[in-house]
Swiss-Prot record:
ATP binds at residue 630. Keywords: Aminoacyl-tRNA synthetase, ATP-binding, Cytoplasm, Ligase, Nucleotide-binding, Protein biosynthesis. It comes from Pseudomonas putida (strain ATCC 47054 / DSM 6125 / CFBP 8728 / NCIMB 11950 / KT2440). PANTHER family: LEUCINE--TRNA LIGASE, MITOCHONDRIAL (PTHR43740:SF2), LEUCYL-TRNA SYNTHETASE (PTHR43740). The keyword Aminoacyl-tRNA synthetase applies. Pfam families: Anticodon_1, tRNA-synt_1, tRNA-synt_1_2, tRNA-synt_1g. Belongs to the class-I aminoacyl-tRNA synthetase family. One of its GO terms (biological process) is leucyl-tRNA aminoacylation. CDD domains: Anticodon_Ia_Leu_BEm (cd07958), LeuRS_core (cd00812). PROSITE patterns: AA_TRNA_LIGASE_I. This is Leucine--tRNA ligase. GO terms for cellular component: cytosol.
Amino acid sequence: MHEQYTPRDIEAAAQKFWDEQQSFAVTEQPGKDTYYCLSMFPYPSGKLHMGHVRNYTIGDVIARYQRMLGKNVLQPMGWDAFGMPAENAAMKNNVAPAKWTYENIDYMKTQLKSLGLAIDWAREVTTCKPDYYRWEQWLFTRLFEKGIIYRKNGTVNWDPADQTVLANEQVIDGRGWRSGALIEKREIPMYYFRITDYADELLESLDELPGWPEQVKTMQRNWIGKSRGMEVQFPYDKASIGHEGTLKVFTTRPDTLMGATYVAVAAEHPLATQAAQGNPALQAFIDECKSGSVAEADMATQEKKGMATSLLVEHPLTGEKLPVWVANYVLMHYGDGAVMAVPAHDERDFEFAHKYNLPVKAVVRTSAGDEVGSEWQAAYGEHGQLINSAEFDGLDFAGAFDAIEAALIRKELGKSRTQFRLRDWGISRQRYWGCPIPIIHCPSCGDVPVPEDQLPVTLPENVVPDGAGSPLARMPEFYECSCPKCGAAAKRETDTMDTFVESSWYFARYASPNYDKGLVDPKAANHWLPVDQYIGGIEHAILHLLYARFFHKLMRDEGLVTSNEPFKNLLTQGMVVAETYYRVASNGGKDWFNPADVEIERDAKAKIIGARLKTDGLPVEIGGTEKMSKSKNNGVDPQSMIEAYGADTCRLFMMFASPPDMSLEWSDSGVEGASRFLRRVWRLAQAHVSQGLPGKLDVAALDDAQKVIRRAIHAAIKQASTDVGQFHKFNTAIAQVMTVMNVLEKAPQATEQDRALLQEGLEAVTLLLAPITPHISHALWQHLGHAGSVIDAAWPSVDEQALVQDSITLVVQVNGKLRGQVEMPAAASREEVEAAARSNENVLRFIDGLTIRKVIVVPGKLVNIVAN
């Protein structure tokens, strides 16, 4: 055994061994417990960042631990390889996105391997390869034929300069991120998944996921947004509108119907279009509403604007004439593109009514009273007893709901309805680097799915996009084709799919990545699925995790999987944060400096109180800790850390510095500390091994001092097993190992029994560290005399007998204050403990002259004497 700990050599040797032995290749083994551990696969951006390292280390620790429990463990890896960044990089570097993507994958794969992850690389999937997306296209055609995918017009952000559609995040202050042109809202035909058909099930089956964080389930419940309300129809005023009809609205507050003073419609609503005829000012306002972002978040924060029309509708219960307004806060694709406005009890309507001098009528008695003032109060939105509501006065919310519904049904002007906030999922993207949509547009036959024997529709990979619209739409060699039904000349769809589609089913493909007869091999999929443990960032709580759950149900309904949910347990890891440093630039902006380029000064409590740039020695501002990012220049390159300290040190620091679900603050001194600890373990093992391995430990012959050491070893095993197995608290498990190391370093090594006990301790340390620092554990296990590999060793078991104590120390309190200690046999009775406490010399001083009222004995811990 080498005297020095040399991580580079140790890690290279372990990784070579795992590769040669194919240690992590898995096959289905019926009858053996399975465990599927999956971390969210990365986008191949170019190189790993510390967030990746943390995510994949957490997954690897769990996977290796489960393997030590004797389970057949699957831990695969792949690449979420389609998407905008590749197109942007391609334009910047004048290189095809495919080339850029594949080069990044090669480099990042090398990085992942250097971390020593227990991954079955034979199952690798790359979503931009035709053998992957072919099956996505196959499923698309099946769902299109069933009507679960349909085509309709959707509102998008249109950049008139680049002639392309922009995502919401590409619209900055109403302008295109690249062209700077004012953005317009456009209606274009798009494909949609009917996810709303599954809304109820997606909501209800959240209750089948006790292994998910409550926060994530709440976020999904809110996103799905089930609400019971009322569909209310306001009859058209024939005199102003010119024909009969009704304006349909949905409200969750039908109890406030008697307080409606106007109605508002979206700019795209037919009534808005009618009102704008011959009214250029209104038409201009409608055009203004149609430009700008279609993002819901932007709509919520923008200034509320409106314009009156000359149109009126009738209140369904009173017949009162209400004015129709066009408002920018009403969305055509939400509800029915119209709202009834009750300014007294809705903040948005209140703001609008005050701005445009519209009537406010209170109809609910709230904790703020019966009147509504000139400033909005949260109380105005409360439920309460109805007032100013004719025959409905005095009713509470539930009573009013039923009574108003009955009145509307009698007039055939309304009924209760359940509505969801969730909208159908539009997946058409006018982008190049994505999965082609397998539809052919025929002048005679309409939209025709590409037949199975013509799949995949392959994306040409030698294209360099220029940013002006989709390159596919300018490639006749791609879109010119013949109709599969009638053989006439037809046009292939040039939109590609939202990249969330690929990541919605990849977890299932890992079960049979090379299967060529279908999306998944049902036998393999049902052997492994659902995933036992899924690990990823909380930022994916809604979209990715909701879409993956939806896709799992689609696959179930296609007969491909039998389970209802894809992920049994979910761990959302915290961010990796680091200090930030900057100087204010001459233009008022900030120049950010990497922590590695800054020299810091700390106070006695280790708080940073000053910082200077190493190059010029001049001060820089301290910006506090922030998530590692390029924009703040506070990232640490994992590769440089691995080269300097080794992967095991990085893994140990990541797991020790914070519980996995909390933010982790990067600390160079913490990394140094992790490295020092591994050197200590190596040093102790090397000194032990160099004297020759001892014989077997005779547990029955241990003296009291040896029993204390053995108790420390097994107490650590017990606690670490709970921490890792039940709570994923790797930081406290590592703390247990450190405690044992302190004991072992001080333990005597004079006799054969002493050395046999040290051998047991070092084996326990090696096994407890094996999932966390696998390379050093691989080497230590061999040096400690084991023929097999540590990855095939079992997790250490607790000898409960070792934890039994012959005697225990109890603290003695008088009136809750510590006044002494007594050493007692572990089996001592309550009476014996009380007698010993009362006769303790120090305790006697504090109870002298007092009357003892009560003696409380907490077995094994303390005695409290209450006296006055």
